[in-house]
């Protein structure tokens, strides 16, 4: 169980996420529609759908809205032209960036994404330019470290790959395939996670110690997340403690 401190950076990113309910709802609806289209309307057998439904409920999206989105996806309504496209590039300081989008118009999305990179002194790259630096995996996080032993027992028995333990959190790591089974086992054991999702996790980190570069990275991420077509933004940035303190000031 190799632990590396990432909680401060993770929490800082979450604090910066888009606060607009309308934008958040739109992104979740698109993800629900696509998840239902690809894996079916039954959340019990569709881990991707189950994960996004839980996240949608956590931001107070109504069950009716969620069910309508599921039916749209499962029935193929208004969704034939919605495609998942991932863009890759670099921000300042050599920070690798993956941008996951869902779009019905590539002629709109490509220039919008490129603008976010160029406006913040980054560069949009070609397919494969940074994706090799990331691994797709499930992450299930808990803030209550007192549950360490129980979480470890249940998660490893259910097929988790690893568990990282820090002073302020526990992170259960799974393969994408076992994510649903591990999450179900933890829930059945009465262990409710604070966050659970399949993500692109960086294999190496690009540490930023300059506050101006850090501001540029944050601006780029915020600009990308503000785009309607963008679903997720992943980077390998790791801010130094000094930079984090200045960003939070």
Curated annotation (Swiss-Prot):
Major localisation: cytoplasm
Locations listed in the record: Cytoplasm
Membrane spanning stretches: none
Keyword Cell cycle: no
A GO molecular-function descriptor: DNA binding
GO cellular component: cytosol
InterPro entries (UniProt xref): Integrase-like_N, TACO1_YebC-like_2nd/3rd_dom, TACO1_YebC_N, Transcrip_reg_TACO1-like, Transcrip_reg_TACO1-like_dom3, YebC-like
Pfam families, alphabetized: TACO1_YebC_N, Transcrip_reg
Keyword annotations from UniProtKB, A to Z: Cytoplasm, DNA-binding, Transcription, Transcription regulation
Domain of life: Bacteria
GO biological process: regulation of DNA-templated transcription
Stored HAMAP family: Transcrip_reg_TACO1
Family the entry assigns: Belongs to the TACO1 family.
Record-given protein name: Probable transcriptional regulatory protein ACIAD2052
Organism: Acinetobacter baylyi (strain ATCC 33305 / BD413 / ADP1)
